[in-house]
């Protein structure tokens, strides 16, 4: 019985390692199966977005890198679309040269080599593999730095500057034209009707110590009136145009000119000699010469010394004595006025009047009687004032006698 137990024990002991081996093999198989199953889970994954980027800001002219940021097993394939849904493709020839504007890498990077302002917008990355597809969108913003706006503003500034310059030049031309017209009008006035006649009349009045005729007075009055009228016209013309007040005080200037030539300022009086009993009350027959005007050293008594360099001129004075008719004498006594006429008008009235008591006597045609003074004609020299003063009382004794003085240069 003991032998049988020992034999069973010996038989059982060899079977234990076998069981351990069998269990070990079974455990190894299960582990292998579990490992293989885990490997299959890791290698077969759907693409996932590992990072999200909202927008990218790029300066115009620079390059831009846009990352899709998608991971998957196996590696997904990437496609890029712009904001209008157009698929971006890299041309083969550009890919071989390594150039081109759009460069797409296998890792999901989109490289825009030279960004323009028209490239702004949203870019969508589509990543796909055998397990699925995922999309990722990134917005590209471009900073506009092109020189077109600078050129635009430069053109606007040049146009504005040109307009301002044209307006200024037009205004200056209008001012210049206005001043030229004003100057031309003033010069034309004084050249035709102004200072020339007035100066001539007063030069004759200065050279002869008597008033020549009533026509000189009329000329002076007309000239003064026209001068003042032109001054008012120039003043109104200057006020009508919005220009600087260059000739606003033209009337004052004209009045000063009148004072210089002796029409406004009180000075020395020279009165024409009238017959006895006749009052020279008419103020129109009185000329005034200002005291401020001094005669020059010229022998011709000019207002300036210009005649010192000129040849001397001689003045001849012709005196005509004409008896008045009875009708004219009666009119003078009744009306109490004395009218002065020119030499030509007096001679014509004396020749054609049928009521004249006796014919007029002229120094060149008729000789006077011993009772009347002999008229004197000096063709080549100026009569001295003493001779004139000596002959005047003899002539003025007759109330019916009219004395006419005529001067010739």
From Swiss-Prot:
Tissues in which the UniProt entry reports expression: Highly expressed in testis.
Phosphoserine: residues bearing it: 298, 303, 306-307
Superkingdom per UniProt: Eukaryota
Biased composition (Low complexity): 363-377
Record CDD domains: Ig (cd00096)
Domain named Ig-like C2-type: residues: 47-141
Modification sites for Phosphotyrosine: 287
Extracellular side: 29-149
Cysteine pairs bridged by disulfides in the record: 68-125
Biased composition (Basic and acidic residues): 339-355
SMART domains per UniProt: IG, IGc2
Gene Ontology cellular-component annotations: cell junction; cytoplasm; neuron projection; nucleoplasm; nucleus; plasma membrane
Keywords: Cell membrane, Cytoplasm, Disulfide bond, Glycoprotein, Immunoglobulin domain, Membrane, Nucleus, Phosphoprotein, Signal, Transmembrane, Transmembrane helix
One Pfam short name: I-set
Function, in words: May participate in the nuclear signaling of EGFR and MAPK1/ERK2. May a have a role in metastasis.
PANTHER family reported for this sequence: MICROFIBRIL-ASSOCIATED GLYCOPROTEIN 3 (PTHR14340), MICROFIBRILLAR-ASSOCIATED PROTEIN 3-LIKE (PTHR14340:SF2)
Protein name stated in the entry: Microfibrillar-associated protein 3-like
Organism of derivation: Homo sapiens
Lineage of the species this protein comes from: Eukaryota, Metazoa, Chordata, Craniata, Vertebrata
């Amino acid at each position: 019985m003991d032998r049988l137990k020992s034999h069973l024990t010996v038989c059982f002991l060899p079977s234990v390692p076998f069981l351990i081996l069998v269990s070990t093999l079974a455990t190894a198989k299960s582990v292998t199966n579990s490992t293989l199953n885990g490997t299959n889970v890791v290698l077969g994954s759907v693409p996932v977005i590992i990072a999200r980027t909202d927008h990218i800001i790029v300066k115009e002219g620079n390059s831009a890198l846009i990352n899709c940021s998608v991971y998957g097993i196996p590696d997904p394939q990437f496609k890029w679309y712009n904001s209008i849904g157009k698929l971006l493709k890299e041309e083969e020839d550009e890919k071989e040269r390594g150039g081109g504007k759009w460069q797409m890498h296998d890792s999901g990077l989109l490289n825009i080599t030279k960004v323009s302002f028209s490239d702004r917008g949203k870019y969508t990355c589509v990543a796909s593999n055998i397990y699925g597809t995922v999309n990722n969108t990134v917005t590209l913003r471009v900073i506009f730095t092109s020189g077109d706006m600078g050129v635009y503003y430069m053109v606007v500034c040049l146009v504005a500057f040109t307009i301002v310059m044209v307006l200024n030049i037009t205004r200056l031309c209008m001012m210049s034209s206005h001043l030229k017209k004003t100057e031309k009008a003033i010069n034309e006035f004084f050249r035709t009707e102004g200072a020339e006649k007035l100066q001539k009349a007063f030069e004759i009045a200065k050279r002869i110590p008597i008033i020549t005729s009533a026509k000189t007075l009329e000329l002076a009055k007309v000239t003064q009136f026209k001068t003042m009228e032109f001054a008012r016209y120039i003043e109104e013309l200057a006020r009508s145009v919005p220009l600087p007040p260059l000739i606003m005080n033209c009337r004052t200037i004209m009045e000063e000119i009148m004072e210089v030539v002796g029409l406004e300022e009180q000075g020395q009086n020279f009165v024409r000699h009238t017959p006895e009993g006749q009052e020279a009350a008419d103020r129109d027959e009185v000329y005034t010469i200002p005291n401020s005007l001094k005669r020059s050293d010229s022998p011709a008594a000019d207002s300036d010394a210009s005649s010192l360099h000129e040849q001397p001129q001689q003045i001849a004075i012709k005196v005509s004595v004409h008896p008045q008719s009875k009708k004219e004498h009666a009119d003078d006594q009744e009306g109490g006025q004395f009218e002065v006429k020119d030499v030509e008008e007096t001679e014509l009235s004396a020749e054609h009047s049928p009521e004249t008591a006796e014919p007029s006597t002229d120094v060149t045609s008729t000789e006077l009687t011993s009772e009347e003074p002999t008229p004197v004609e000096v063709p080549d020299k100026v009569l001295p004032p003493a001779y004139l003063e000596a002959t005047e009382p003899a002539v003025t004794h007759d109330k019916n006698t009219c004395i006419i003085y005529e001067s010739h240069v």
